[in-house]
Regions:
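Short, hinge-like loop/turn segments at secondary-structure boundaries
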Residues: 48-49, 137-139
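N-terminal amphipathic, basic helical "cap/leader" segment at the start of enzyme domains
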Residues: 1-78, 176-177
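Short, solvent-exposed amphipathic alpha-helical segments in soluble enzyme
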Residues: 47-48, 101-104, 168-169
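C-terminal helix-cap and adjacent tail motif
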Residues: 71-72, 142-177
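Short, surface-exposed beta-edge/turn micro-motifs
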Residues: 27-28, 81-84, 148-149
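Solvent-exposed alpha-helices and their adjacent loops that cap or buttress functional pockets
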Residues: 22-25, 76-79, 140-146, 166-167
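Small-aliphatic-rich amphipathic alpha-helix that forms the alpha element of a beta-alpha
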Residues: 16, 85, 90-136
Length: 177
């Protein structure tokens, strides 16, 4: 698996750093993981922690899928991509998720412009209060006063970026006044 050049990764991160933030707070923290051993260790930990969970009626479908795949023992939350960028932000900050979402979207747009594949990854956010995952992420630089807000994987698509037909939007209603 080919890791994108560091310069390309830095360009993607820089796009995230220039995303809007509430009151121009600029508090989104980016943790960039390219070490294959760390990614493998984190993958095993995430699978083990999801496997401990029970599914419940009404559970968010992606979370349910994560739990079920983990119980089967074949779950890679980061799809074995060579780069994982985790975002974190201050606990108690009212715009933590929104600011990080803006940064993640900017990074996805930049990745596309650089012919890199990307995918939004929420699993570490879902496991932010899991003691094992939390301890591991703190060793990687997430602060005790921070909450994990999201993530993004980067890499090269096996067959290049796919040509996509725009999907018809049926949700996200618009109300005009």
């Amino acid at each position: 698996m080919r890791i994108p050049d560091r310069e390309l990764i830095e360009q993607v991160i820089e796009a995230g750093r220039y995303a809007p933030s509430g009151g121009n707070s600029q508090t989104t923290h980016f943790i960039v993981i390219t070490d294959a051993g760390i990614l493998s260790e984190l993958e095993s930990l995430v699978q083990a922690e999801f496997a401990k969970m029970e599914t419940v009626p009404g559970m968010y479908p992606s979370l349910r899928n994560s739990v079920e795949a983990s119980k089967r023992g074949n779950y890679s939350f980061h799809y074995r991509a060579p780069v994982l960028i985790v975002t974190a932000n201050q606990k108690g900050y009212g715009n933590a998720l929104v600011d990080s979402a803006c940064a993640l979207e900017n990074m996805m747009v930049a990745a596309n412009a650089l012919d890199l594949g990307s995918c939004w990854i929420n699993q570490l956010h879902w496991l932010d209060e899991d003691a094992e995952v939390r301890a591991f992420m703190e060793k990687l630089g997430v602060g005790e006063n921070e909450t994990i807000t999201g993530g993004l994987i980067l890499g090269y698509s096996a067959d290049g970026l796919p040509a996509r037909t725009p999907l018809k939007r049926t949700g996200n209603p618009v109300t005009w006044i």
